[in-house]
Amino acid sequence: MKLLLAIALMLTTVMWASTQQPQAVHTYCGRHLARTLADLCWEAGVDKRSDAQFASYGSAWLMPYSEGRDQRGIVDECCLRPCSVDVLLSYC
């Protein structure tokens, strides 16, 4: 009985570990970055941000900071350095 329990525990651990693979990272630049982001956002069902959502702020100079991802941009995160799909999706 103990052997069967040990085998079941080992198989469960192996199966769990195989699903916990790190997400692949790639470098996306230029047209490839724009196309990949558009495809991912479309698949995720996210509409493109419009200027209308920023109208309540009243000042155009606040627009870049209202959704804020610190001072970094998608080029810094995904072109200059490799990034994951999760990072790309955060820009949708």
UniProtKB/Swiss-Prot annotation:
Compartment(s) of residence: Secreted
Coiled-coil spans in chain: none
InterPro entries: Bombyxin (IPR017097), Bombyxin_A (IPR030680), Insulin-like (IPR016179), Insulin-like_sf (IPR036438), Insulin_CS (IPR022353), Insulin_family (IPR022352)
Modified residues annotated as Pyrrolidone carboxylic acid in this record: Q20
Broad class of where this protein is predominantly found: secreted
Keywords on record: Cleavage on pair of basic residues, Disulfide bond, Hormone, Pyrrolidone carboxylic acid, Secreted, Signal
Example of a GO cellular component annotation carried by this entry: extracellular space
Disulfide bond sites: C29-C79, C41-C92, C78-C83
Signal peptide segment: 1-19
Propeptide: 50-71
Signal listed as a keyword: yes
GO molecular function: growth factor activity; hormone activity
Miscellaneous field: Silk worm has two kinds of PTTH: 4K-PTTH and 22K-PTTH; there are many forms of 4K-PTTH.
Function: Brain peptide responsible for activation of prothoracic glands to produce ecdysone in insects.
Quaternary structure, from the entry: Heterodimer of a B chain and an A chain linked by two disulfide bonds.
Family stated for the protein in its record: Belongs to the insulin family.
Name of the protein in its database record: Bombyxin A-9
